[in-house]
């Protein structure tokens, strides 16, 4: 018999585990000043990372408030509740379900936040392929008029879930994790269709791999 626990209980346990692990992990953040300068000027940003490296980002909520686009699936429901418990806002949708509504919700939150609310997207989620970016993050950045910021995480020691599609990385206790932000760059509205959009996706992938 397969036991399915309520999403609320699962999210409570996972949020508690997150806080416990984070107490033992040393975080180092690189190239963060450029983002802070944009936020201070009232300019929101959209941070783009790979799905397997998302663990450390909610820890940065003290400097800003994040709005993350999360899948509308049941697994996404659990993740959204975990993020909410950690102080991260969520817009529900994905590449296949309710994506446009989620984009609009995130854009509205970022515009109203004027630099105090910033977007966060795992660009190869929610189902992969691993390290292959989708175009949703580009649409979000262009519609919100927000610079796009590629970001990577490198941990000295981590447990890798090798059977997961993304090979998710969970930092081990007493490891050091580097959050590395790339240079913010603009996504022109003209890059939202056709070959220009495909080229913009490849550019984002190259920038992410270049951090890594």
For every predicted segment, state its role.
Residues 1-26, 78, 100, 143, ...:
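Alpha-helical membrane-targeting segments
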Residues 1-63, 88, 107, 203-212:
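Membrane-anchoring hydrophobic helices of lipid-metabolizing enzymes
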Residues 134-192:
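A cross-family acyltransferase "interaction/gating" segment
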């Amino acid at each position: 018999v397969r036991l399915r626990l309520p999403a609320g209980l699962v999210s409570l346990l996972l949020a508690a585990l997150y806080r416990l692990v984070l107490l033992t992990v040393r975080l180092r953040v690189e190239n963060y000043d450029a983002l802070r300068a944009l936020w201070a000027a009232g300019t929101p940003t959209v941070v783009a990372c790979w799905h397997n490296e998302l663990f450390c980002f909610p820890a940065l909520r003290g400097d800003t408030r994040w709005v993350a686009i999360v899948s509308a699936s049941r697994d996404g429901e659990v993740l959204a509740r975990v993020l909410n418990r950690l102080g991260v806002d969520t817009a529900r949708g994905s590449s296949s379900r309710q994506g446009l509504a989620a984009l609009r919700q995130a854009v509205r939150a970022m515009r109203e936040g004027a630099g105090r609310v910033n977007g966060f997207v795992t660009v190869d989620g929610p189902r992969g392929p691993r390290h292959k970016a989708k175009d949703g993050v580009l649409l979000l950045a262009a519609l919100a008029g927000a610079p796009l910021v590629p970001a990577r995480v490198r941990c000295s020691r981590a447990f890798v879930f090798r059977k997961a599609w993304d090979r998710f990385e969970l930092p081990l206790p007493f490891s050091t994790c580097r959050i590395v932000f790339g240079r913010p760059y603009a996504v022109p509205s003209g890059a939202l269709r056709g070959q220009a959009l495909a080229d913009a996706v490849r550019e984002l992938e190259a920038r992410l791999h270049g951090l890594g």
